[in-house]
Design a protein with these regions (language model features):
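Short catalytic/ligand-binding loop motif for oxyanion handling, primarily in non-cytosolic enzymes
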Residues: 12-14, 35-38, 109-111, 143-147, ...
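Structured beta-strand-rich core segments of catalytic domains in phosphoester-bond hydrolases
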Residues: 33-107
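N-terminal, active-site-proximal structural segment of metallo-dependent hydrolase catalytic domains
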Residues: 1-44, 49-63, 237-239
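Metal-dependent phosphoesterases centered on the DNase I-like endonuclease/exonuclease/phosphatase
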Residues: 26, 118-199
Length: 239
């Protein structure tokens, strides 16, 4: 099983060829357009997006999940309430009736409170009693280095909440690295080599993490013409 997450920085319909080369079973794509409302399309995009789920408000920038046409995916339910608003953006789904995921693109939210990782914190807080087998994957817009900016719901708190129910970061476990000390950036602010950050993640139950076959972080020189992010690709043995 191979899963890829990538913030495409918009215009995903024009970036299908390099993404398709990853040959993943599931793609989690942030900042992508709603495939059902794309007016100018190509055959390769139509084929790639034939089996998808998408959430968002702006038809040009949302959160999409794409899989092979023969695969089965369906949305599942999580409590995404935050007062009178909704948490943004999280897409819980089930793959082939056997794997549960939560795709993520941590956003500013609507209230001005608990932005980015704070949105993820409240998702965990709302649902933690039922989150022990899910795979969380996506752009959290967060890193431990920014913990000092928050009095509640920081990055380290979220990592700890997940670890307490047996869910761990694949990158950090497989590469034997510490949070906040990542050697491989996933994001280059303003596409600047000198502003690298690790803000994209996969968290999974430890028994799945231990079955990791490969964990790859894309090279910026290969992706800088397409986005300020690089793909994070996880392959694991499903048996």
């Amino acid at each position: 099983m191979k899963i890829a997450t990538w913030n495409c920085n918009g215009g995903f319909r024009n970036k299908i060829e390099p993404v398709s080369a990853i040959d993943a079973d599931i793609y989690i794509i942030q900042e992508c357009e709603d495939p059902s409302r794309v007016t100018k399309s190509t055959d390769i995009y139509k084929a790639f997006s034939a089996n998808h789920i998408w959430v968002g408000e702006n038809k040009n920038k949302g959160l999409g999940v794409f899989t092979r046409k023969s695969s089965k995916i369906s949305m599942t339910e999580l409590n995404q309430d935050f007062g009178s608003a909704k948490l943004k953006w999280f897409l819980p789904f089930r793959y082939e009736d056997r794997l549960d995921f939560v795709a993520a693109w941590a956003h500013r939210g609507d209230t001005g409170e608990f932005r980015y990782i704070g949105q993820f914190y409240w998702l965990l807080k709302n649902n933690l009693g039922s989150l022990d087998r899910q795979i969380f994957i996506g752009d959290l817009n967060s890193n431990k280095i920014w913990d000092y900016k928050r009095s509640e719901g920081d990055h380290s708190t979220c990592v700890r909440m997940l670890e307490e129910v047996g869910i761990h970061s694949v990158y950090h476990h497989f590469r034997e690295q510490q949070q906040g000390q990542e050697a491989d950036p996933t994001f280059y602010l303003q596409k600047n080599w000198h502003k690298p950050y690790h803000i994209d993640y996969v968290f999974a139950p430890l028994e799945r993490v231990k079955k990791t076959k490969t964990l790859e972080v894309g090279k910026f020189e290969s992706w800088q013409n397409y986005s300020d992010h690089v793909p994070l690709v996880w392959e694991f043995d499903e048996t």
